[in-house]
Amino acid sequence: GCRWQLFAQNTELQGGESKTWRFNGRFKCNFKANIKANLKANLKAKEPAPKSVVLATTTLTYNADYLSQCHVIPWVSFASPPSSIASIIERGLNDDDNFFNKREKKDVFGWRHYGEIDADHEALNAEVPDEFISHYNNQYDPLLGMTLQFLQGGDLRWLALIRPLQQHIQDIDIYDTDKDKAEYNGGLMWHTDHYLSAQTCTHRSNSKYHEHAYDGFLGGGGPGGQHCYTSGLTLQYWLFGDPSAKQSVAQLCAWIRNFYNGSGSLLERTFRLLTIDIKSNQLTNIGFKAPGYKYPLDRGTANFIIALIDNYDLTAEPALVLEMATIIRHTFHPNEDIGLRDLKNVEQSWFYTIFLQAVVRYLLLKESLEEIDSDYWYARDGLIHFGRWMLNNESYYLDKPQQLEFPNDTWCAQEIRKANIYYYCYYFCSDHNPQYLHQAKAYYEYITQRLSTSSEAVYTRVLAILMQNDGVEQVFLGHPPQSAVPYQRIEHGAPPKLTLTTAIKHFLFDLFRLSANFSLAREYRWLAIRLKMLMNT
């Protein structure tokens, strides 16, 4: 018989990796005319005829006005003039150190790494930066950011970066297995730890040469809740109909749920009681959890909410919206004493801003569904409560560099989160406080002025943050919008307090609930994996 040997017989894979092979074919009736037209166009432009002219594909761009009007991505606008940070973002395409040239410098063309973005910011203090390899693993969702840029202006160079990146994320960065711990299975691999060369670790785990950096298991290397990005993958399904992207979103959503809520094991729930629930103001394996709350006020919880939102956008399952509300209620409170959060300890708590951004997306979703209920008002009042605190207490991170471990311009890029929160606090606040608009504009001016002259502005992490958060400023140009939902005062009661009695009560309730689906195999598996790890250390 006839055999098509299109693909290599053997492909080296590490745990949780996969390899997707694709080939393109084209069938066109007016085949010769198409070739002649392309050749004629190239000759007229005095350009050589491309070898791929026969397999050239048609690429469609989207009308920016239409995208803005239909609110398919409701928290940004595409129809307005470019944002104030657009020229900085465009350096990712036009600068000498653009994304394409970064790939060339590091020779990132092997199948495992192709599409990956070079984490050049980690080489800031390296002796030989061009020989420093660090894996980025989609931190701050550049897949989303680049896709938003493609939709914003239709520049096909973004598309040339997006397509291999999304395949790399699905094949390599996502830990596609069910044979590890539940809090690892199906998760997104963490980026290489800061300012360390990847050495021998590829994308999978810590290198043996990193032992000094992982004391106390605080370093990167494996899946962790604070590194979960689903929005870029969601857009790949919406725009290109990629079913594997949709499946990856569902998988990441299930993983991060297991990471924070557990897999249903009674032993696991008991372990959480001892290591997380009864601890107060301490760093735990899910993050820094304030007394009385189940979830930490950080980017991990934000990622959990965003994953649920993205999964809902793809499936329309109502239970996901209720789950978002439950997480928000167990993370902050509209009447809490924010001073107890120690938010001025920037290194430990700056990512509360990412949580507030997730609350904004939840509120916009609730408004689009016309679900104006107690969950909506809890989240809205909580957002404004923290927004007022920000007006009176927040300042630029780099104004106090002594409070930062690495005072570089990544901190300047992170200011865009505060700016966008201020904009949406204006949108949701009942008194239409103009201070929110003033602060938002001031922050954008600060970011633009500083990064326009910064040599660090072209670094991958800086650009990823800006791209991920671009588009909000345009929403508020001209006549700034305000929520059409009339304000309604709701009593939210007192914020929760941590006591041993309440922790044990919640524990016993969970044991009763979990016992309904008790599985001896699940309990054995949970214990066996951990005993095996202990024996190997």
Question: Each predicted region: which residue ranges?
Answer:
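Catalytic cores of extracellular degradative/oxidative enzymes
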Residues: 1-30, 44-388, 395, 427, ...
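Membrane-proximal basic amphipathic "stem/tether" segments
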Residues: 272, 476-537
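Intrinsic-disorder/low-complexity, polar/charged segments
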Residues: 31, 317, 430-433, 453, ...
